Amino acid sequence: MASILARRSLNTLRARHLVLSGQALQGSHLSRLQSRGISYGSNKDDEEAEQLSKEISKDWNTVFERSINTLFLTEMVRGLSLTLKYFFDPKVTINYPFEKGPLSPRFRGEHALRRYPTGEERCIACKLCEAVCPAQAITIEAEEREDGSRRTTRYDIDMTKCIYCGFCQEACPVDAIVEGPNFEFATETHEELLYDKEKLLENGDRWETEIAENLRSESLYR
């Protein structure tokens, strides 16, 4: 490859040299016809010859650089040197799932329904979360109890519709529905992502400690 580039560049230089030589000869012939232009023509020829030598030197330098780049693969070496540099840099990734990074207290993960410390359900069936949900993923049915309070008989969330905007958690006046810290809830079937009230309460019981701590740490900003 380098020899081909060198040969092409040499042929180009020869052709340019012949053209400039022809122009120089034509200029010298005209100078002979002019009695007073001999010295001017010779000076011009000297300048053209000097310019030609500079261009030839420059072109040979270009040919030499191209040959070196082709023979020694300098671009590849430059890329490999960059790879080698980052190879010894400190790692910025973790070995998931054996290692896990920290989560923000505002992280919005799997949904959960919370209880009071007495075990009573927090949800009062106001349906604000159902009304505010932009994806219409929440379905609530409720009935009135003997003591006059309202509690849900059905609380479903279609997790395949949920966009994890957190509006349900923001709208809830009693912190009943929350998005917990769990993000590992992938399933193999669609039906497993249709959460009912029992599933949501189970999530709340499992993650209550983390959820309560996150809510306390963010209480000044809510």
From Swiss-Prot:
The EC number(s) this enzyme carries: 7.1.1.2
GO molecular function, one term: NADH dehydrogenase (ubiquinone) activity
Positions contributing to [4Fe-4S] cluster 2 binding: 133, 162, 165, 168
Group of enzyme by EC: translocase
Catalytic activity: a ubiquinone + NADH + 5 H(+)(in) = a ubiquinol + NAD(+) + 4 H(+)(out)
Cofactors: [4Fe-4S] cluster
Cofactor: binding details: Binds 2 [4Fe-4S] clusters per subunit.
Chain residues that bind [4Fe-4S] cluster 1: 123, 126, 129, 172
Cellular compartments per GO CC: membrane; mitochondrion
Annotated Pfam families: Fer4_7
4Fe-4S ferredoxin-type domain residues: 114-143, 153-182
UniProt cross-references to InterPro entries, sorted A to Z: 4Fe4S_Fe-S-bd (IPR017896), 4Fe4S_Fe_S_CS (IPR017900), NADH_quinone_OxRdtase_chainI (IPR010226)
Keywords: 4Fe-4S, Electron transport, Iron, Iron-sulfur, Metal-binding, Mitochondrion, NAD, Oxidoreductase, Repeat, Respiratory chain, Transit peptide, Translocase, Transport, Ubiquinone
Organism superkingdom: Eukaryota
Compartment annotation: Mitochondrion
Similarity annotation: Belongs to the complex I 23 kDa subunit family.
PANTHER family: NADH DEHYDROGENASE [UBIQUINONE] IRON-SULFUR PROTEIN 8, MITOCHONDRIAL, NADH DEHYDROGENASE UBIQUINONE IRON-SULFUR PROTEIN 8, MITOCHONDRIAL
Purpose: Core subunit of the mitochondrial membrane respiratory chain NADH dehydrogenase (Complex I) that is believed to belong to the minimal assembly required for catalysis. Complex I functions in the transfer of electrons from NADH to the respiratory chain. The immediate electron acceptor for the enzyme is believed to be ubiquinone. May donate electrons to ubiquinone.
Subunit structure: Complex I is composed of at least 49 different subunits. This is a component of the iron-sulfur (IP) fragment of the enzyme.
Protein name: NADH dehydrogenase [ubiquinone] iron-sulfur protein 8-A, mitochondrial
Native source species: Arabidopsis thaliana (Mouse-ear cress)
